[in-house]
A protein has these predicted regions:
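His-Asp-centered metal-binding catalytic motifs of divalent-metal-dependent phosphohydrolases/nucleases
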Residues: 55-76, 98, 117-123, 137
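Solvent-exposed, flexible loop/coil residues
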Residues: 70, 75, 80, 146, ...
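Helix-adjacent hinge/juxtasegments
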Residues: 74-117
């Protein structure tokens, strides 16, 4: 059973930390912290994908990219191994940051360990909650971030990234991906990735 006060305080602290993101995104004419928006969107998707999401899953969804801007991509080589090193460092950082907040607000070690496992994507393919978090993450990427990369990436690279994204998704997640409202260009690239 969710302790509403403790949960609300944990979410407030996670949101406060993500609200410090210097990168901004315009939403309805208002500049908002990018990581805060991303975390909220992932949480919203988790709630759509899972009828009764656990407290741990909701905490992981909100904190799985906690203060991502603190470890920029350009600190690592622009290679596939460099990308993987960066992602591994990010996951550990996010898990540590989230665990610190959860400990401060009084969560048990059992809950903290579970949230860390979800953030670190431990055995996520065999874990329904891990799959839901991955689906939510992928759906938010497709829905809100893909368009921004189109001018940066070559078409072949974009299709390759989309293929990898789709391979990570469950059948339910793929069903939702097919119903996203995307630009014509994004929809065409997604279609190419599926074929």
């Amino acid at each position: 059973m969710i302790d509403d006060e403790r949960f609300a305080e944990a979410i407030r602290r996670i949101d406060e930390a993500n609200g410090e993101d210097p990168r901004r995104e315009l939403v309805d004419g208002t500049a908002q912290a990018r990581e805060l928006l991303f975390a909220r969107r992932v949480c919203d998707w988790v709630r759509k994908l899972v009828a009764e999401p656990s407290e741990e899953l909701l905490l992981a969804a909100r904190g799985h990219t906690l203060q991502r801007w603190m470890i920029p991509r350009d600190r690592y080589p622009k290679t596939t191994p460099g990308y993987r090193q960066w992602r591994k460092a990010l996951a550990a950082f996010h898990a540590d940051q989230a665990a610190g907040i959860l400990q401060e607000v009084g969560y048990s070690e059992t809950t903290i360990t579970r949230v860390r496992a979800l953030i670190l994507r431990e055995d996520w393919r065999d874990d329904p909650e891990g799959r839901a978090l991955e689906d939510a993450d992928c759906l938010v990427f497709l829905e809100t971030k893909l368009e921004g990369y189109l001018d940066e990436w070559e078409e072949k690279k974009t299709v390759n990234i989309l293929k990898k994204t789709l391979r990570k998704m469950s059948p339910a997640g793929l069903g939702h991906a097919g119903s996203l409202r995307l630009s014509d260009r994004c929809a065409e690239l997604l279609r190419q990735a599926k074929s």
